[in-house]
Swiss-Prot record:
Gene from which the chain derives: rplQ
Keywords: Ribonucleoprotein, Ribosomal protein
Family per similarity comment: Belongs to the bacterial ribosomal protein bL17 family.
GO biological process, alphabetically ordered: translation
Gene Ontology CC, one term: cytosolic large ribosomal subunit
A molecular function GO annotation: structural constituent of ribosome
Keyword Translocase in annotation: no
Region described as Disordered: 124-170
HAMAP family, alphabetized: Ribosomal_bL17
Composition-biased stretches (Basic and acidic residues): 135-148, 156-170
UniProt name for this protein: Large ribosomal subunit protein bL17
Pfam families, A to Z: Ribosomal_L17
Low complexity bias spans: 124-134
InterPro entries named in the record: Ribosomal_bL17 (IPR000456), Ribosomal_bL17_CS (IPR047859), Ribosomal_bL17_sf (IPR036373)
Organism: Desulfovibrio desulfuricans (strain ATCC 27774 / DSM 6949 / MB)
């Protein structure tokens, strides 16, 4: 009986399953969003959301716990310095799973995109602000334009050069 056994097995050994989920978590935190199967995305959410909660705590013990999963000091630093503060006032739900219309070619597995919810919203909100803040460059007068470069001509091939030399000799 499967009483109080949570989590999916994925037809893998426990060590393989743990390594797969940790690698998916690393990829998600590095890239912000990844494409995987729906079931892996749902399991990945169970790994990533506690990591972001640890990043909101921002103490030494939380960093060590995050390092146990990520096994990369640079990624732990990024998690605590960049990703954690973005979700500071959010009580949970740090990831979003978007189901894709097309299944995976080959085995017809249902695919999904899992992404960090705030990172895509903040990037979308900052893009118009950055566009407004960028100064508009003034157009240069036509007199200051650079002169047009002469068109490049093609060099004759060795066979054509021999044929032309033979014509000149005759």
């Amino acid at each position: 009986m499967r009483h109080s056994n949570s989590g999916r097995k994925f037809s893998r050994t426990p060590a393989h399953r743990k390594a797969m989920l940790h690698n998916l978590a690393k990829a998600l935190l590095i890239h912000g969003k990844i494409r995987t199967t729906e079931i892996k995305a749902k399991e990945l959410r169970r790994v990533v959301e506690p990591l972001i909660t640890l990043a909101k705590r921002n103490d030494l013990h939380a960093r060590r716990q995050a390092y146990r999963v990520l096994n990369d000091h640079a990624l732990v630093k990024r998690l605590f310095d960049e990703i954690g503060p973005v979700f500071a006032g959010v009580p949970g739900g740090y990831t979003r799973i978007l189901k894709m219309a097309m299944p995976r070619k080959g085995d017809n597995a249902p695919m999904a995109i899992i992404e960090l919810s705030r990172s895509s919203e903040t990037a979308a909100a900052e893009a118009p602000k950055a566009a407004k803040a960028a100064p508009v460059k003034e157009a240069k007068p036509a007199a200051e334009e650079a002169p047009a470069k002469p068109k490049r001509t093609r060099k004759p091939k060795a066979d054509e050069a021999d044929a032309e030399a033979a014509k000149e000799e005759n």
